């Protein structure tokens, strides 16, 4: 999680980029779970034109299946607060969904939820982890479930959102 480095670290990164860019334009992107973002971070992103990727695995019941804090408490409400802040500060952002065994069973519901949030940029990546024996972990999405998930999302996207919502894989 890059926010653990603190905002001063990224302010320094930006200063070094300006110092050494030699007139070249640099585009910065920042992927985060969103938990530690605040108004200062949002102002920094807006003022410096950074694209922010926020990890959101669906509505609360889908997201909070695996996205909990160190105490095991759900994080969906904090991510939604972050999204509201990004919108308020007019920061360009996209949503990245880690597709796992649980949320892969709900492609239409998940996509509709993301549609309602209004961001035109979406990414889906499969969770594929292996246990010590080389077998897929219990949380991982199988290849069949991943394919079905993408088909379900694509069916809605191609009918309703083509040219309006950009899904990285389509």
Annotate the PLM regions.
Residues 2-52, 56-62, 69-81, 85, ...:
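Canonical radical SAM enzyme core domain
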